[in-house]
Amino acid sequence: MPDLHTLPAGSRPERAIRNNGPSDLALERYKLRELAEGWPCYRDACEWENLRSIFHPDAHIYTTWTGLTHHLQFIEASKTGMDNGVFIMHRIHGSTTDIDPSGVRAVTKMKATITQRFSGLPCVSGGTCEADAESDCRFIFFWEKLDGSEYPELDQQWRARFVRHWYEKDKLIAVTAGRDPVIDLEKLQQYPPGYRHLAYLQESTMGVKVLLDLPGHRREGSTVNGQKHDLFQEYPMLHGCNSYKDNRGFPTTLKSIALREIRMKYLFDVI
């Protein structure tokens, strides 16, 4: 078991404002909480226009079933999935925000549970049954307050440039007591503990290939998921998301960067 209580050096940006601070920045943090909580509230209710209003026009996100994708592609994939019977909901538990002193960059960490209903599963007692796979996560939002130079209509609006999830703990719940789904336990163990049942059933029922190297909890230690949590590597600094882009127009260094590193660099090195 890794040392869970000594966080990696630099994991807490010393110049970030959080918890109290100036009233004007507290108001900005409140705005960011409202935006972050909009993801699950708007997506689950199919309020697509409201969901789009959270993101920068060139924002990208990462999920188990889409991988790295543009937010508009994620919305279209969500619509298609819903039309095909995919039933994903979210529960919000709380959030914190680190904001830079100038009030133009911020990072929000939102605790939430992703819960997906799977129907028509083979049942241990015969027939079929339903089950909910749930993963407790941290949604990490990287915000920029736009100055209107590129998008005048968005002047002084906060928009998410990038969103990624840390998958920390999951479980499988039978919808009806005594009606448990048949599980291939050997295959199940091939998936990461933070989203094991979710990944197992997404691959089994949705025809997708789930990414297996997404960030997990620190207790996962030397596994790829534990390493992604604490990954430390050198990379070009993010500068307005306009440099160091790959062939999909996205900064290559954001694909697997550590939370502690990107928080510090995003908040301060580009100011």
Curated annotation (Swiss-Prot):
UniProt name for this protein: Uncharacterized protein ATEG_07673.1
Cleavable signal peptide: none
Pfam families: SnoaL_4 (PF13577)
UniProt family annotation: Belongs to the PEP2 family.
InterPro entries tied to this protein: NTF2-like_dom_sf, SnoaL-like
Source domain of life: Eukaryota
Disordered, as annotated region: 1-20
